[in-house]
Amino acid sequence: MSAGEVERLVSELSGGTGGDEEEEWLYGDENEVERPEEENASANPPSGIEDETAENGVPKPKVTETEDDSDSDSDDDEDDVHVTIGDIKTGAPQYGSYGTAPVNLNIKTGGRVYGTTGTKVKGVDLDAPGSINGVPLLEVDLDSFEDKPWRKPGADLSDYFNYGFNEDTWKAYCEKQKRIRMGLEVIPVTSTTNKITAEDCTMEVTPGAEIQDGRFNLFKVQQGRTGNSEKETALPSAKAEFTSPPSLFKTGLPPSRNSTSSQSQTSTASRKANSSVGKWQDRYGRAESPDLRRLPGAIDVIGQTITISRVEGRRRANENSNIQVLSERSATAVDNNFSKPPPFFPPGAPPTHLPPPPFLPPPPTVSTAPPLIPPPGIPITVPPPGFPPPPGAPPPSLIPTIESGHSSGYDSRSARAFPYGNVAFPHLPGSAPSWPSLVDTSKQWDYYARREKDRDRERDRDRERDRDRDRERERTRERERERDHSPTPSVFNSDEERYRYREYAERGYERHRASREKEERHRERRHREKEETRHKSSRSNSRRRHESEEGDSHRRHKHKKSKRSKEGKEAGSEPAPEQESTEATPAE
């Protein structure tokens, strides 16, 4: 209990003037004196508080006299709640505890260092560099801490390290950040946005390229919160400006044809510019460096001149948009740069300054051009399917010489030129011959007659094969029969038996030959009948006509003979009709 409460209880118990004393205690002179003191304390903080501030500008709390009285009367003398009267100075908040070494394990990354700003703002400055006991955050060595609570058993690492860091990865991260800020390490330009965030502040490395007045800005480093437009306008970020990096183009977009030849130049330039970024950042306080600016102009590459196209590749933290290529060139620049084609391009090759139409595939780069030696089966004069004519000079087989008798078109007719954008390119002369010269369409009806003849020939061949097969079979059968019927040499005792066996063998051979001839005759007759039945419809009329003529002549002949015999009978000679009848019978 406080002293005022004790006095009030005593006055209530004593009675009498207790009410007046209570009013004096509530509204008396003491209260009037205390109010201006509190107002003065809130307006002007006491000098003792300023003397006890820590090194990095965060005040240590000081206990006032009234709080001393209340603490002396309270039961808990080691209360952790401390009240600070006055303005809280800006800076990174410290969470130190009394009696122990102040260790801040809630690590935040450093913000932008742009030098001192003129005015102090109330609240927490998010752009202030993080520090632990006045030491910059990236230079703090974790091994210097005596107490390492994150190593204790059962400790949760997420209470001490944010964003999945542990002790080893945090050391590596600090080392890398120090090297990047000193300009010793080149920031890699990748296709994704690399963000390393710790608690509230983010550091964003944005790959992309900007052109302002013809100069390229390869990358832009942002630290702190993104989207703070006031601070971004007041404090411009660092930009290194040099020539076009070829690796920023996506594969779907048509790059310049000589990107490979300029790649080595731009990579060396990027290394030099990156190494010098950190030096002038520390020296000039991240202001724009006049030394790195280059005059706008064109890059001279062997064979042709190309201008710098405008590429913008900014990304925010929550956007996954592709790098946009915006070609902003006037017509006069195109006409000045490409009034004449390069000397080594053929007349039929597509020009480089015109964008390809959207419905055609992009022209291949020098590295992806099709090989000049085609696979077997494809003539070298025909480009592979899916590819336009390759850039650069065509192979010698595509260029017709003066002595070659090729005409400029197909079959002495000029072929239609295929459009490529707004420019038409004629076909290359001396290409493959046309289809009508390969396939003769005027004699298509010969094909069917030829096919019928081939079929008949195949049939005859099959028949001959069958006959040969049958003959072979019969010969083997004969040999087997002779083997079966042939007696042993001991049987041939007499000449008669030998003669009888020879006669038997000859008779068997004659019989077999007769049967074979009969089979062949029978087979030929069958074949003839098949052929006749096949062509019966065409021959039937002529056969009928022939048979009727034969029948008529035969009848006429018989009629004449019968007349003669009648005349002979009338003459009265008997042997004459017999002779005539005998003559007539064989005629029948």
Swiss-Prot record:
GO-annotated biological processes: mRNA processing
Ranges annotated as biased composition (Acidic residues): 19-40, 66-80
Bias kind Pro residues: ranges: 340-398
Start-end of Basic residues biased regions: 536-545, 554-564
Annotated segments matching region Necessary for stimulating PAPOLA activity: 1-341
Intracellular or extracellular location(s): Nucleus
Biased composition (Basic and acidic residues): 1-10, 280-291, 448-486, 495-522
Signal peptide start-end: none
Job of this protein: Component of the cleavage and polyadenylation specificity factor (CPSF) complex that plays a key role in pre-mRNA 3'-end formation, recognizing the AAUAAA signal sequence and interacting with poly(A) polymerase and other factors to bring about cleavage and poly(A) addition. FIP1L1 contributes to poly(A) site recognition and stimulates poly(A) addition. Binds to U-rich RNA sequence elements surrounding the poly(A) site. May act to tether poly(A) polymerase to the CPSF complex.
Protein name, UniProt field: Pre-mRNA 3'-end-processing factor FIP1
Organism (species): Pongo abelii
Gene: FIP1L1
